[in-house]
Amino acid sequence: MPLDSIQHAAQEQFQKQSHRYAKGHILENTSDLAAVLDGLPIPADAKALDIATGAGHAAFHLARAGYKVTASDLTPAMLLRVREGAAERGLNVETREHSAEALPYEDGTFQLVTCRVAPHHFSSPASFVRESARVLAPGGWFVVIDGTVTDDFPEAEAWLHEVEKLRDPSHNRLMPPKEWRAMCEASGLTVAKLNIDYRKQPDLEWYFQAANTSPINRAAVRSLIATVSDSIRQEYRLAEEEGKIVWWWPTLALAAQKPVL
């Protein structure tokens, strides 16, 4: 299926930046995934699909847990990093190249579908949720971790969207919790966990480097930070520490189950 403009932008961005995600990246710490999976009744030999896997850190976590893992991504360079990383770790991870919105699997193929810190790049999050629900077996689990925005605070949402789009043009949208819940329910999934945590973004310069942000866009982001309203500054706890601009990023962790027939 041909890529749309948003998918093409994401593929182009991560094709160029794949080397930044393989080692020493913040996403190597998968304690967030472990927390949301904790207590879910997932079979020990479950077939798991990790969508938009990036460098494969979530997929490696699932493989270490004993699941039969397929790691998928839109970007060939990322999938190469996954294969290299799996080999280095002695893990068995299958890779597949495809978008998040059209999954090339039969209905009910997997007991677990995960997606970590990626849906804000998707052209159609609703299609992603619907397709994830389709490929889940009855009783299977859909698990998502991604940045989010506070429900019913459009000013803060618009500001963060502008910052993110300048930082990384492949960004599409961070969605509030109520929209995630609505998409799950519309796809026949029952939300069992929905938690919001705030993570410290400790250095604006690292934030730029991770996306190879242009000098012009870096200056634009700094201007947005310098002129931000008090309400948004408080929402994201924007501050300066030891000469570095820091803020606290809201992150959503969700687990939803496909009903048992």
Describe each PLM feature range.
Residues 1-44, 57-61, 78-81, 85, 143-166, ...:
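Conserved class I S-adenosyl-L-methionine
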